[in-house]
Curated annotation (Swiss-Prot):
<protein>
    <recommendedName>
        <fullName>UPF0297 protein Cthe_0151</fullName>
    </recommendedName>
</protein>
<dbReference type="InterPro" id="IPR009309">
    <property type="entry name" value="IreB"/>
</dbReference>
<comment type="similarity">
    <text>Belongs to the UPF0297 family.</text>
</comment>
<dbReference type="Pfam" id="PF06135">
    <property type="entry name" value="IreB"/>
</dbReference>
Length: 90
């Protein structure tokens, strides 16, 4: 594939729902333990180090069941859909 062609990246719908549910549960677990959930999740996504995620409510083992690129895709999807919903376009 040359640099002039656009590669396609797709995640199955089922995995999108799984990623969304997982992010919500991990967010809640981190919040309950007094952590800044955004900072901790970003640390995990950037580094791949699961110790950024608490063991509380089995969040650490759960987050490892979904690939980090799938988590990032879901975060980006939710963010952009929210922006589009408010402004009509990105």
């Amino acid at each position: 594939m040359s640099n002039n062609e656009t590669m396609m990246f797709n995640v199955e719908k089922e995995k999108v729902n799984e990623a969304r549910e997982l992010l919500v549960s991990v967010y809640k677990a981190l919040k309950e333990k007094g952590y800044n959930p955004i900072n901790q999740i970003v640390g995990y996504i950037l580094s791949g180090d699961p110790t950024y995620i608490t063991n509380h409510l089995d969040a650490r083992s759960s987050i490892r069941k979904v690939e980090r690129d799938e988590l990032l895709e879901e975060i980006l999807r939710c963010y952009l859909e929210e922006c589009i919903g408010k402004e009509g376009s990105v």
